[in-house]
Amino acid sequence: MSLTYSSMLELGTELIPFNLSNTVSKKHFSSDELDNSKPSLIMFICNHCPYVIHYHSEIKQIFHDYKDQINIVAISSNDIDNYPQDGPKEMHDLWEKLGLSFPYLFDETQTIAKAYKAECT
């Protein structure tokens, strides 16, 4: 695994619009569907990352504790040719296994990840 330093947009940054495939519902999900009266947590994750795997229980806890107070969305922008375990079916299967229901979106072109300056999971 290579060492890539994380970057993060400043808290309070205005939401960058997106419309991506939701691997949970198997429909597209638009940022317009988020409740504008609540803050949003946008996580860039992937199935195979050991750091993300380590935090599965924390992600579940955040969802359980805050699902009614904030919008929660996860986005994977990995290249599935290089990481087939990060494909939409595998994303759906992982969410089902973890018992999560918030959107897990697939950013196939990495356009949204680049817009959010996501460099690693």
Language model features by range: what are they?
Residues 1-32:
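N-terminal "domain-start" segment that seeds a small globular fold
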Residues 16, 40, 120-121:
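Short loop/turn microsegments at loop-to-beta-strand junctions
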Residues 30-55, 59, 72:
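Short active-site neighborhood of thiol/selenol oxidoreductases, capturing the structured segment around
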Residues 54-96:
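Structural microenvironment flanking redox-active thiols in thiol-disulfide oxidoreductases
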Residues 92-121:
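Short, internal strand/loop/helix patches
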